[in-house]
């Protein structure tokens, strides 16, 4: 991997780190990051009080590509639901309140992030 691919990976990591800091400030308890199954990955799994929250982080460095959350398509939402279901089964969590949030991170030229948290995004 080199060039733009590495830049995208670095940008994604920066966005996830910014999202974790943001959620911790809001008193979320982070329980897992990068939960993977065959179908894909959930970026962050956390508790917001007694609700288990599956968080998709989307990061952009330029506004020309649109706002980050626009890339959470219906098919991506379906994929995240299936992965979340697998997480619940694997961890024997049964019938607990859950929701799906999106954290949108826009990285400015000076490296400063702007974060938008969309609770119950889908």
Where are these regions (language model features)?
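Mg2+/Mn2+-dependent nuclease catalytic core
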Residues: 61-81, 87-90
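Hydrophobic "anchor" residues on beta-strands that sit immediately upstream
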Residues: 28-29, 52, 97
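Domain-level recognition of nuclease-like catalytic cores that cleave nucleotide substrates
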Residues: 90-122
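Acidic-basic catalytic patches of nuclease active cores, encompassing PD-(D/E)XK
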Residues: 1-33
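Conserved catalytic cores of phosphodiester-cleaving nucleases, focusing on short active-site segments
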Residues: 23, 42-64, 80
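Short glycine/proline- and charge-enriched loop/turn segments
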Residues: 1-4, 60-65, 119
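Short acidic/glycine-enriched loop/turn segments that link adjacent beta-strands
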Residues: 37-40
């Amino acid at each position: 991997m080199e060039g733009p691919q590495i830049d995208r990976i670095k940008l994604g990591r920066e966005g996830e780190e910014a999202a974790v800091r943001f959620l911790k400030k809001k008193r979320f308890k982070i329980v897992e990051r990068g939960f993977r199954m065959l179908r894909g990955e959930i970026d962050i799994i956390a508790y917001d009080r007694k609700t288990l929250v599956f968080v998709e982080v989307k990061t952009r460095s330029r506004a020309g590509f649109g706002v980050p959350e626009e890339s959470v398509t219906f098919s991506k939402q379906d994929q995240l639901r299936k992965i979340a279901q697998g997480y619940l089964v694997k961890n024997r969590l049964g019938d607990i309140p859950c929701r799906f949030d999106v954290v949108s991170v826009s990285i400015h030229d000076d490296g400063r992030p702007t974060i938008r948290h969309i609770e119950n995004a889908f």
